[in-house]
Amino acid sequence: MTKYLLPFAFFVRHSFSDGGSPARLKLVSLFLILFLPLFTRAASILIPMDDTQKDHLKSYGVAFWVLTAGKEVDWLLNYRGGSFMTNYEKRIENECRIRGITYEVIADAKTAEILNEIGDPSVNMDFVKLEKAPKIAVYAPKNRFVDVDDAVIIVLKYAEIPFDVIYDDEILKGDLVKYDWLHLHHEDFTGQYSKTMRRAGNQLSFAEDKKIQEATARMHGFQKVSKMKLTVARLIRDYCAGGGFLFAMCSGADSFDIALAAGNTDICDAAYDGDSADPAAQSKLDFSQTLAFQNFQVDVNPFSHRFSDIDVGRNRHISPSEDFFTLFDFSAKWDVVPSMLTQDHDRVIKGFRGLATAFNISKLKPGVTIMGEMKSNNEARYIHGEYGKGQWTFYGGHDPEGYLHNNGDTPTDLSLHPNSPGYRLILNNVLFPAARRKKLKT
């Protein structure tokens, strides 16, 4: 651009040095009108993700929308809360306005300044290029037993990020290969129906759910629901090994590993599958089959609400006002993966409960990355790891903006929580597969 500006500057100087003829002045004015906007054009749209952002959650939706339009997005790790930046287009600016998010239109010089700041070796920042919108699937039942207050379903709808709901039928048919990212609904992969049988008010729901699940199992050639769920869990694990991205919350995390470990035994009471649990089940657990957890004790008591001692949420005595966990600060330039997954405008996140609230740190496998923990209680709330060519993330608790979850509760209205730090962690995982693979150094 400079090679065009220098001759023009020389021309302007001589045009005015002698007062300038009217024709020459008119020509200069016309040139300024036509070409000056090119020299001062808007280069980028910056979506800040610090405390200035009006709606953090919908900001992820805009970034996803830009990707679906075939455009790239730069994720600026640790810059103003993990901001997004993309090349300026009027339609992108319009979309930001429509969705009500905070954005800034910046020129070339400011874009270069930001990238120079991020590239400084002395600062804990980096940028990751997001290239293609991942195809999203949520593993959840399609009948009335779907958890309408599932946090992932709620936030995907609020952020206007498209997704498909798939369940056992689709997975057993091999449909997982169609997707880049899978969320596990708050499922019980052990075949014990989340141990709801004897909970007050759940008897009829338990009986109906059991009937539906057993019919599905028989249709696919399984004698027991637990055997069908085990096969589904193994297929999901294979999906991850092949390069898929797996995200699970609450009981979808611990029951997944429990089912895999118990693949060669029976941990289900007769009330759940028609025969008694194997008395030697504990000794037959195979922890080499799991993703995250090892050396845990299963709870085969049908009257207990616990699956195992992985979850420490049942025994903790912490008031809601004191229940917080802290995100780790990773090196953005070297620990790129956990840095992406922990981008947030708050580093201390308020806790929330669920069937699986918090993970016992002593039960984690070596190599598991703890991204969020309550150190004083020896519990991990947010963990990550690799399996084969894929990656997985487990997040304890049910609803980041609903401390106590009960069946039948009204789903959280995220328009009342547009800046939720806890929900941001979910959306970090949704965008994660869009990142250029060669940048993932961890």
Description of each model-found segment:
Residues S44-I45, D50-K54, M85, E89-N94, ...:
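Helical hinge/lid and interdomain linker segments adjacent to catalytic or ligand-binding clefts
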Residues D147-D150, V155-K157, D254, T265, ...:
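Catalytic beta-strand/loop cores that center a nucleophilic Ser/Cys/Thr
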Residues T2-F8, V12-V28:
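Bacterial N-terminal signal peptides that target proteins for export
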Residues A261, A270-Y272, A281-Q282:
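Catalytic cores of eukaryotic secretory-pathway lumenal/extracellular enzymes that build
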Residues G119-N124, D169-I171, N377-R381:
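Alpha-helical scaffolding within the catalytic cores
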Residues K26-P37:
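Bacterial N-terminal signal peptides
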Residues A43-P48, K54-M85, A233, D266, ...:
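Extracellular ligand-binding/catalytic regions of CAZymes and related secreted enzymes
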Residues A42-V148, G397, L404:
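Hydrophobic targeting/anchoring helices
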